[in-house]
């Protein structure tokens, strides 16, 4: 399950955590800690004849209480140990390197070599191939391949370039080729890598609101049980005198009873559940800026999902050639192939492949044709080829219409009908024109990812609404939304429209999650309850989000929601189990503890425990051992299933509520029998 090194380190840390300064952070376990100290003191007082407490029995109680505290420490130390193991690999990427600081951006020969730790925000550095990027920054000049495997674990290099949404670089990553001029955006100790290490190690982990609320509940229950236990000594003294039978409860038994009734199981595991949840997110290559963000992910009920890369494969594929009247399909395919032969985009290559498959149209001798290729630009929104007094263009319908009209041609109405048909089916139409004559339309189809419809169905079962965000026109968006099975869509989306949509849902009381990578996504990311910024995105997007996906995968949002829900479920399930345990331990201890004074209570000794001594020993042994038994579950998390919240609650109440009632009865009885057979009691 875990490496031996982590186990060994956790055992050492368990003893170090016995420090009062650390124990006071967990009020419930502090109660056990104080109880262990008191029981130990009573043992020594009894040993030297100062007290009437049974020395052997008191020693056994004291030792079991100390082990209970150690087991709780061990659970937390194991979770922290996993985090430290992750952090150690990250620290290897964080090392001080010499940086070429430019005095003048325009003169790359005029540099000062400074240590990366001495760089300040705004400094300009020059990085060459095979060098490590010294600090987080924004590329202001150049384009290069960057190896980010030290952070993301992905071995394939990624492109980083100035301008656009791929300009952010991370300190500790390595340039594979070319060069970059980078403006530093962080100082030592505040870099992305530093934040990752701090988060993974748990150094900057703060208790979440739900965690604090649960701890307040546990402390309140502990105080109530403390008050009840404190009254037992005078009460039993009075009752035994009045009944003329039995004797007052001993201080050792009061301590043992208090520890058994207090919610120690969840108190011991609460911290490890939170740390393990953060660790699971880190293992998914997601950095959360706070535990609050993970909890919010568990409560999310609206997901805003980008169409491209999340719902569709991202690369549209040519599926049909649709000619206008008077033009054959092969004629259209021939012109489309010529206009796309130099197009290196996935869409362009798919047009060439389709022409070859349908009509066996292959490459030409472009040198002999004296061909000149026309690349696509955002201004013209067209690409094409000029050869031997022929001109072919392909592009968006409105761009081609403007081109044809400007050159004195006529744009056929029939083409409008074909364009509308393609858009209505969820495709992207590209119009082809040769020598100012419209030939027809290339049908580019968005390929919806396999299994995505089923995933959205699962999300719907969980009560989560999915909304597709796309820049496509409403007809295209509606067709893709229907095919993918999302609940709603936002077409022709702008940054302002996304921001307003998030606010609208939040006003209705929903929690909203979204992903983004560009500077234009920053306002919406800042507004969303769970905002996942892509690691390939801009600095502005990363700063606006409360999570960063190191893999830059838009589909990761669904996994983040699952991890958040699993964290909340694990905490809820173990709390239910712990409270149910207390009820069972109550029936184990109270009857045998008091039937000397009140013989009628013998009827409540449902387990038939041998004696008060064996009952208390069995109960506190179980109380300690159950912590160790539940550590794997607290670290791994309760298995999450896609079903409505009501069914999920009923299922967990049955497993962890009823299970929490039955397990102690069986375990305590078995321990009691073992103690009796061994002659310990």
Curated annotation (Swiss-Prot):
GO terms for molecular function: ATP binding; ATP hydrolysis activity; magnesium ion binding; P-type potassium transmembrane transporter activity. Keywords: ATP-binding, Cell membrane, Ion transport, Magnesium, Membrane, Metal-binding, Nucleotide-binding, Phosphoprotein, Potassium, Potassium transport, Translocase, Transmembrane, Transmembrane helix, Transport. SUPFAM superfamilies: Calcium ATPase, transduction domain A, Calcium ATPase, transmembrane domain M, HAD-like, Metal cation-transporting ATPase, ATP-binding domain N. It is found in: Cell membrane. ATP binds at residues 343, 347, 376-383, 394. It catalyses: K(+)(out) + ATP + H2O = K(+)(in) + ADP + phosphate + H(+). Its EC number is 7.2.2.6. Mg(2+) binds at residues 517, 521. The chain crosses the membrane at residues 30-50, 59-79, 216-236, 255-275, 587-607, 615-635, 661-681. Gene3D superfamilies: Calcium-transporting ATPase, cytoplasmic domain N, Calcium-transporting ATPase, cytoplasmic transduction domain A, HAD superfamily/HAD-like. One of its GO terms (cellular component) is plasma membrane. GO terms for biological process: potassium ion transmembrane transport. It is a multi-pass membrane protein. Pfam families: E1-E2_ATPase, Hydrolase. InterPro entries: ATPase_P-typ_cyto_dom_N, ATPase_P-typ_P_site, ATPase_P-typ_TM_dom_sf, ATPase_P-typ_transduc_dom_A_sf, HAD-like_sf, HAD_sf, P-type_ATPase_bsu_IA, P_typ_ATPase. The active site is at 306 (4-aspartylphosphate intermediate). Part of the high-affinity ATP-driven potassium transport (or Kdp) system, which catalyzes the hydrolysis of ATP coupled with the electrogenic transport of potassium into the cytoplasm. This subunit is responsible for energy coupling to the transport system and for the release of the potassium ions to the cytoplasm. Belongs to the cation transport ATPase (P-type) (TC 3.A.3) family. Type IA subfamily. The system is composed of three essential subunits: KdpA, KdpB and KdpC. This is Potassium-transporting ATPase ATP-binding subunit.
């Amino acid at each position: 399950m875990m490496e031996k090194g982590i186990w060994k380190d956790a055992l050492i840390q368990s003893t170090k955590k016995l420090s009062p300064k650390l124990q006071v952070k967990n009020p419930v376990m502090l109660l056990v800690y104080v109880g262990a100290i008191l029981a130990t003191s009573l043992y020594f007082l009894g040993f030297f004849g100062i007290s009437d407490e049974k020395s052997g029995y008191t020693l056994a109680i004291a030792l079991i209480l100390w082990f209970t505290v150690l087991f709780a420490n061990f659970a937390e130390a194991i979770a922290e140990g996993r985090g430290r193991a992750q952090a150690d690999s990250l620290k290897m990427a964080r090392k001080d390197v010499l940086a070429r600081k430019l005095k003048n951006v325009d003169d790359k020969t005029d540099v000062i070599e400074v240590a990366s730790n001495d760089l300040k925000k705004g400094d300009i550095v020059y990085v060459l191939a095979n060098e490590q990027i010294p600090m987080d920054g924004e590329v202001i000049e150049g384009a290069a391949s960057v190896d980010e495997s030290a952070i993301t674990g992905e071995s394939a290099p990624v492109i980083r370039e100035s301008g656009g949404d791929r300009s952010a670089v991370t300190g500790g990553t390595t340039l594979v080729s070319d060069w970059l001029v980078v403006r530093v955006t962080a100082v030592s100790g505040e870099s992305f890598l530093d934040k990752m290490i701090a988060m993974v190690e748990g150094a900057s982990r703060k208790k979440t609101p739900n965690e604090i609320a649960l701890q307040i509940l546990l402390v309140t229950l502990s105080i109530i049980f403390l008050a009840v236990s404190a009254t037992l000594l005078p009460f039993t003294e009075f009752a035994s005198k009045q009944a003329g039978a039995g004797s007052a409860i001993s201080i050792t038994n009061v301590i043992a009873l208090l520890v058994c009734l207090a919610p120690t199981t969840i108190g011991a595991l609460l911290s490890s559940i939170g740390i393990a949840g953060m660790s699971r997110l880190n293992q998914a290559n997601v950095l959360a800026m706070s535990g609050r963000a993970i909890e919010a992910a568990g409560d999310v009920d609206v997901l805003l999902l980008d169409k491209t890369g999340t719902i569709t494969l991202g690369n549209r594929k040519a599926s049909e050639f649709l000619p206008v009247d008077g033009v054959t399909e092969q004629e259209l395919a021939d012109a489309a192939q010529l206009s796309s032969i130099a197009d290196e985009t996935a869409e362009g290559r798919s047009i060439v492949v389709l022409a070859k498959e349908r009509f066996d149209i292959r490459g030409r001798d472009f040198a002999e044709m004296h061909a000149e290729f026309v690349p696509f630009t955002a201004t013209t929104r067209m690409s094409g080829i000029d050869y031997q007094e022929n001109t072919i263009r392909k592009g968006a319908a409105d761009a081609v219409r403007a081109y044809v009209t400007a050159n004195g041609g006529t744009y056929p109405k029939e083409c409008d009908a074909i364009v509308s048909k393609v858009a209505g089916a969820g495709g992207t139409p590209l119009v082809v024109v040769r020598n100012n004559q419209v030939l027809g339309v290339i049908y580019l189809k968005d390929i919806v990812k396999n299994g995505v419809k089923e995933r959205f169905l699962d999300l719907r079962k969980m009560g989560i609404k999915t909304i597709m965000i796309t820049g496509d026109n409403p007809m295209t968006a509606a067709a893709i939304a229907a095919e993918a099975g999302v609940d709603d869509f936002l077409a022709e989306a702008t940054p302002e429209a996304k921001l307003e949509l998030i606010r609208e849902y939040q006003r209705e009381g929903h929690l909203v999650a979204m992903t983004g990578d560009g500077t234009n996504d920053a306002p919406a990311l800042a507004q969303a309850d769970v905002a996942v910024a892509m690691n390939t995105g801009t600095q502005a997007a990363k700063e606006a989000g409360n999570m960063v996906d190191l893999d830059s995968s838009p589909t990761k949002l669904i996994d983040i929601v699952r991890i958040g829900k699993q964290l909340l479920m694990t905490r809820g399930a173990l709390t239910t189990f712990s409270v149910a345990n207390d009820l069972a331990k109550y029936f184990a201890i109270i009857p045998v503890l008091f039937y000397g004074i009140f013989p009628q209570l013998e009827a409540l000794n449902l387990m038939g425990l041998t004696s008060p001594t064996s009952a208390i020993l069995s109960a506190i042994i179980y109380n300690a051992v159950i912590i160790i038994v539940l550590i794997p579950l607290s670290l791994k998390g309760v298995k999450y299933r896609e079903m409505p919240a009501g069914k999920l609650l009923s299922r967990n109440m049955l497993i962890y509520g009823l299970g929490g009632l039955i397990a102690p009865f069986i375990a305590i009885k078995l321990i009691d029998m073992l103690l009796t057979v061994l002659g310990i009691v």
